[in-house]
Amino acid sequence: MVLNYIFIGFFVIGFLVALLRVIGYLFRDYLEATMGWVFTEVDLNVFSDMVQSTFDMAETSISIVLYLMGVMTLWLGFMKIGEDGGAVQKLSALVSPFFRKLFPEIPADHPVNGSIMMNFAANMLGLDNSATPMGLKAMKGLQELNPNKDTASNPMIMFLVLNTSGLTIIPISVMAYRAQAGAAHPTDVFIPILIATFSATIIGLITVSFYQKINLIKNGIATYLLSISVIIIVGVYGLMQLPKPVLEQVTSVGGNFILLSIIITFFILAFKNKVNVYESFIEGAKEGFKTTITIIPYLVGMLVAIGIFRASGTLDYLVDGMGWFIGLIGINTDFVPALPTAFMKPLSGSGARGMMLETYSHYESMNLGFSGADHFVSKMASIFQGSTETTFYTIAVYYGAINIKKTRYTVQAGLIADLAGIITAILVGYIFFH
């Protein structure tokens, strides 16, 4: 129901804002003379931009689906090898003590536990290309256990919110963009991103647990979380002792090495258990094509709505309003120019990435004597990019793949986690870089 309201809201709010911009242009001389408000032909042409955005986003949706089709076909093939060879079942048994408490409605020995863990691992390593297919595989497994096939189950919501909180231990993509932009130390956002994503994950977990009446302390989940926190802190501390060039190499190579090691392990176990690896791969790969086709209407609808909202200028006004309010209450506003990346990230990953890169370019053009990627605002944009996930895109893709129409409180919980990530990102950004 909430997703329905948001979908309508993107269109209606976008239309109303655009209408006000056109009216403002028609009375531009009076408004400039009396209020100091300036309207240009850009405001007059806003409806043309909005209509064009519908075609652009529809095309973008299909481009994403075509890309996903190849990736899904590949990774569902690998996952099928893992299932037939027994690797996924072994992983399920390993994580079942913790998952039994976090997902009480999932049987302890169900293979979906392994798919969920594989997805979490890929996300933590910053391997987005493999995380999505693994996540969709997990959603299909959860749908098998779901008594109401058009309504999101409790395990689905918990899984999706933890997914959208975007816990990342190695933010490979953000560091790569910073290196490409000429940052002196591309990895210096590593720790802030980890802290922000961990905060978002914890708040997301607490929020969903509140909805689902899961007692984190009584069930022992808090103990698991504390243990995981200690492991992460120790691991990060060890990495930070490395020289920066070595750290960049480790973070770049480490995640991909682990991923390929998992694939090879799947192959070895399957071969050992006398599984026809090639036939198993083909059987799993067929599911990739079928799953991707199901996603198309959900993805087109959501991305077109986001495109309308963005092209109307609403997001720009929202950022300007936030800057005005923050300045009004006396808080430092140096981070405000980076907010477009933060606000765009839950809506569109590519849009947020574009905002971040535009920020780099803007400060690079100012000839400050150092790389534009090293400006405080650029570092804040980098942390925002790495600290939250594309909530609406993820919901559209994951629920679309299994035809879930009633999302219950998924959106609310996901956005609460995103907000926690953004607030933490601002705090750690000031602590580390301001």
Regions from the PLM with identified roles:
Residues 1-70, 179-310, 327-329, 384, ...:
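Signature of multi-pass transmembrane helix bundles
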Residues 37, 117, 121, 156, ...:
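Generic signal for short, ordered secondary-structure residues
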Residues 45-144, 273-366:
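Membrane-embedded alpha-helical segments and adjacent helix-loop junctions characteristic
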Residues 104-107, 111, 147, 171, ...:
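Proline-rich intrinsically disordered, low-complexity coils
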Residues 113, 150-153, 260-261, 335-336, ...:
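Short hydrophobic/aromatic segments of transmembrane alpha-helices and their interfaces
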Residues 130-131, 138-179, 183-213, 342, ...:
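C-terminal transmembrane helix pair
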